Curated annotation (Swiss-Prot):
Cofactor note: Binds 2 magnesium ions per subunit. They probably participate in the reaction catalyzed by the enzyme. May bind an additional third magnesium ion after substrate binding.
EC number: 3.1.-.-
HAMAP family attached to this UniProt entry: Fen
Function: Structure-specific nuclease with 5'-flap endonuclease and 5'-3' exonuclease activities involved in DNA replication and repair. During DNA replication, cleaves the 5'-overhanging flap structure that is generated by displacement synthesis when DNA polymerase encounters the 5'-end of a downstream Okazaki fragment. It enters the flap from the 5'-end and then tracks to cleave the flap base, leaving a nick for ligation. Also involved in the long patch base excision repair (LP-BER) pathway, by cleaving within the apurinic/apyrimidinic (AP) site-terminated flap.
Compartment list: Nucleus, Nucleolus; Nucleus, Nucleoplasm; Mitochondrion
Protein name: Flap endonuclease 1
Coiled coil is among the record's keywords: no
Spans annotated as I-domain: 122-253
Post-translational modification: Phosphorylated. Phosphorylation upon DNA damage induces relocalization to the nuclear plasma.
PANTHER family for this protein: FLAP ENDONUCLEASE 1, FLAP ENDONUCLEASE FAMILY MEMBER
SMART domains: HhH2, XPGI, XPGN
Record text on subunit structure and interactions: Interacts with PCNA. Three molecules of fen1 bind to one PCNA trimer with each molecule binding to one PCNA monomer. PCNA stimulates the nuclease activity without altering cleavage specificity.
Amino acid sequence: MGIHGLAKLIADQAPGAIKEQEMKNFFGRKIAIDASMCIYQFLIAVRQDGNVLQNEDGETTSHLMGMFYRTIRMLENGIKPVYVFDGKPPQLKSGELEKRGERRAEAEKLLAQAQEAGEQENIDKFSKRLVKVTRQHNDECKKLLTLMGVPYVEAPCEAEASCAALVKAGKVFATATEDMDGLTFGTGVLLRHLTASEAKKLPIQEFHFSRILQDIGLSHEQFIDLCILLGCDYCGTIKGIGPKRAMDLIRQHGSIEEILDNIDLSKHPVPEDWLYKEARGLFLTPDVVDCSCLELKWSEPDEEGLVQFMCAEKQFSEDRMRNGCKKILKSRQGSTQGRLDSFFSVTGSLSSKRKEPEMKGSTKKKLKTGATAGKFKKGK
């Protein structure tokens, strides 16, 4: 879900913090990509006659086709992508996940009605609402990325939080996702539409977090409180407080606690057992991948492995797979003259513990590494 209305609010209040870019402008950049968001996009967009692509066994293959070609497109533009997969969702997200389940159940009813009435437009609409990224989708994409020579990371919790940690640690330049909560987790740069279909011709939006805070006059903690007021995945919101009012209240009072002391709670009731403090803590000190022990390597594709997996098992065209491998190899040759930051290597080990930066008091947190030895092929 992300943060309700945040993109528009930033566009209104801090337009100078947003740049419109073309993909070629990120040549030589390492970019952490929210994998689940990408796979969801592919399942929605990569279709034939309104239906997801399938192989002869009836297995969905839209996610694989999307992942293969969109990744190649980035590589051809000199980008070094690293995909970050979600881990276990935080307990605070259970309410949001329950709501999503209710919306799916409603969509199933509406789909059945549309099918009975033969309303193709509604059939397409409600079918897309039922799209869900499964563990099998994730596992197949991880296998594909390994065969393509592209690294991936398994986050211990929310992918966007670990993407932000990679940016903060200087391992990558930006987080690529459609959800704005990457900014709430503190990513220095957030990119939207990087993995969108080329046919849509959407410019890539580049958000700069420090400029956002500067232009709206808030600290990171105040920005987090603003996002909670707008609406996030982890708790409810105060009734009757829209985006502009939320911004005004945070600027005036500085925190949710002070706002609650200064508004009419009979007109603006708060949710029962409102867990805004817990949500704030999750944004400030999330469970993230240990960047100090992470090794990211981009290597040559395993052409025969790709043909076996994508052609023999998934029934893709062998010619297209081999042509794709040629494009990957060519992109590797072209990317040797990259940006200065591409010449620095990252070293790591299998597991470790680290402390989150101290933000309020001294909070110690055990963190799990998202990289294991089998997930990255050795580069030349």
